[in-house]
Amino acid sequence: MNSTSFSQLENHSVHYNLSEEKPSFFAFENDDCHLPLAVIFTLALAYGAVIILGVSGNLALILIILKQKEMRNVTNILIVNLSFSDLLVAIMCLPFTFVYTLMDHWIFGEIMCKLNPFVQCVSITVSIFSLVLIAVERHQLIINPRGWRPNNRHAYIGIAVIWVLAVASSLPFMIYQVLTDEPFQNVTLDAFKDKLVCFDQFPSDSHRLSYTTLLLVLQYFGPLCFIFICYFKIYIRLKRRNNMMDKMRDSKYRSSESKRINIMLLSIVVAFAVCWLPLTIFNTVFDWNHQIIATCNHNLLFLLCHLTAMISTCVNPIFYGFLNKNFQRDLQFFFNFCDFRSRDDDYETIAMSTMHTDVSKTSLKQASPLAFKKISCVENEKI
């Protein structure tokens, strides 16, 4: 997850090439290192599909939530923030990374050289900590429902803090990212004359390693451990739940409902960890010993790891939105250019959002068993 995966995926040739031990370690100097056209075409299709799904999925999710005023609760506000950051990743990370890795030189100018890795790092940090805040909201909702629970104001404050933290942690890219022709000065190939590369130029290797290690903890291991703990506690609580609503339902329905919720919670954590694990491993190995990765295999291996990580921008809308019946209905209305309308009596809050009901605790106690069962079923759908 380390954000330098994006800058260093841009830098990978440069670090090899500037090595004193192997000054001619350029992948582009060896014709055998070029990827076959069939592989490039397949990767282009895959990247294109992820970009389209990531942009359209997150954009639709944002529009649907913003359109429905009744959906602006804590979780949905955080989901909009998550989708917006994923949208930036899909726009800023995928196309620039793919083109630069294949071409081995930068064609997008000095401003984009600094802005691209900066925006990428900001977006990824925001995405991860949005997942953290959603886990916190869910934890308080299920583990401590009578204690402190975040409201919309808390959500907006949390989002502001996330963006400030993300910008601050990404500033080194704006400071140390440079556009230069230094790696190409001794290259004899005419195709690489007057070409430029974009890479980070830290004061020393120790500075670079310290920063990349910090990002590794900040953007992967730290959030992942925290999210896992939150959802594990939620899983245990849901498994042990034996309240009045559960007793009113038959065991088969209770078992299937509990299983559905637990699988969704587990899938969120697994998707986050699995999507980013290959790139995290690749980036860590590259940071500490880049010579361990064969030059000719570097670009292909990196692109595969990077593509896997970018799939997470498509997974989140599915988990947080499109598995919900209302989003399926509203999405259909969206593509049919219809109004986003829904009746209060059949509208289901987005999965993972704060549960609420118009029925008070007093009326709940006075309700008939049949009515209570119906209310409890609706309540669990809202969980």
From Swiss-Prot:
GO CC annotation: neuron projection; plasma membrane
Cytoplasmic topological segments: 56-87, 138-154, 233-260, 321-383
Extracellular side of membrane: 1-34, 109-116, 176-211, 282-299
Subcellular location: Cell membrane
A GO molecular function held by the record: neuropeptide Y receptor activity
Lipid-carrying residues in chain (S-palmitoyl cysteine): C338
Membrane topology type: Multi-pass membrane protein
TM helices/strands, residue ranges: 35-55, 88-108, 117-137, 155-175, 212-232, 261-281, 300-320
Pfam family name, one: 7tm_1
Phosphoserine PTM positions: S368, S376
Residues with glycosylation annotation: N2, N11, N17
Keywords: Cell membrane, Disulfide bond, G-protein coupled receptor, Glycoprotein, Lipoprotein, Membrane, Palmitate, Phosphoprotein, Receptor, Transducer, Transmembrane, Transmembrane helix
Cysteines engaged in disulfide bonds, as pairs: C113-C198
PANTHER family in the cross-refs: NEUROPEPTIDE Y RECEPTOR (PTHR24235), NEUROPEPTIDE Y RECEPTOR TYPE 1 (PTHR24235:SF24)
The protein's role, per its UniProt record: Receptor for neuropeptide Y and peptide YY.
UniProt family annotation: Belongs to the G-protein coupled receptor 1 family.
Protein name: Neuropeptide Y receptor type 1
Taxonomic source organism: Cavia porcellus
Gene name for this UniProt entry: NPY1R
